[in-house]
From Swiss-Prot:
PANTHER family: PROLIFERATING CELL NUCLEAR ANTIGEN
Organism this protein belongs to: Methanococcus maripaludis (strain C5 / ATCC BAA-1333)
Family: Belongs to the PCNA family.
Keywords assigned by UniProt, alphabetized: DNA replication, DNA-binding
A Gene Ontology molecular function term of the record: DNA binding
Record-given protein name: DNA polymerase sliding clamp
Cited NCBIfam families: pcna, PRK01115.1-2, PRK01115.1-5
Length: 250
């Protein structure tokens, strides 16, 4: 069996963040919570989510692989109000996931499930030379600046600085976060540099993986030259991890 009750607002954030990159995913359910990983259709990005049972108000789960149409689930979750309780209930016999919103009014939806099993897709264990922790709002603003210039962006770590850079045929954009400068609002909360590095990425993907963040969310970004960028952040106790392949420059 699988049955879980949680806050609608928090679950909505997790689903929105995941569905920005993938249309379907397999929820791997067990007594410890929900895990899921999937590649985007072009195999450029990987998304992984983990919702431990502690983030739910009530949780019961045996081992199940639940194939979810994320687009359908996202549309249903969007109908939920933040103060409503959200109840997820697996009907294994009918191969459906029941989604119930409960307040003084009860609303119930059912989603047909995909007949899929776990892909055993995991975030690879990569050793990165550099990592930074930065507020999502500042990172997103830098992406917006870069978008004015090009559809690709370079992330650089060099000389105690984290640099977000974009160059077009005529114009360029650069945002520099300096670890050596006092930062009263802790925009750059952590900076660990092992070596200078730079990698270039598709800007649209970076926008998608940060689209559901709040300005004060802390992104942990792992970087290395011509390596995939790994971005981690938490939403009310749930963990989201994104991996994006670099654009190899000739």
């Amino acid at each position: 069996m699988f049955r879980a009750t949680c806050n609608t607002r928090d679950f909505k954030k997790v689903i929105n963040a995941t569905s920005n990159l993938v249309d379907e995913i397999c929820f791997e359910v067990d007594e410890n919570g929900i895990k899921a990983s999937a590649m985007d259709p072009s195999h450029v990005a990987l998304v992984s989510m983990e919702m431990p049972k502690d983030v739910f108000e009530e949780y019961e789960g045996d081992v199940h692989d639940i194939g979810i149409d994320l687009e359908a689930l996202k549309k249903i979750i969007a109908r939920g109000k933040g103060d409503e309780k959200l109840i997820l209930d697996l009907d294994a016999e009918k191969n459906k996931l029941n989604v119930t919103f409960k307040s003084n009014v009860t609303r119930k939806f059912s989603i047909a499930l995909y007949d899929v099993s776990s892909s055993n897709l995991k975030v690879p264990d990569i050793e990165y030379p550099n990592n930074v922790s930065i507020k999502a709002g500042a990172f997103v603003e830098a992406l917006k600046d870069a978008e004015l210039v090009n559809d690709h962006i370079t992330l650089k770590v060099d000389e105690d600085k984290f640099i977000i850079y974009s160059k077009g045929d005529l114009n360029q954009s650069e945002t520099v976060f300096d670890n050596g400068v006092d930062d009263d609002d802790d925009t750059l909360a952590e900076f660990n540099m092992g070596e200078a590095s730079r990698s270039t990425f598709n800007l649209a993907y970076l926008k998608d993986l940060t689209k559901s963040t709040a300005a004060e969310d802390l992104l942990k970004i792992y970087l290395g030259s011509d390596m995939p960028v790994k971005i981690e952040y938490e939403v009310s106790g749930s963990k989201l991890v994104f991996l994006l392949a670099p654009r190899i420059e000739s």
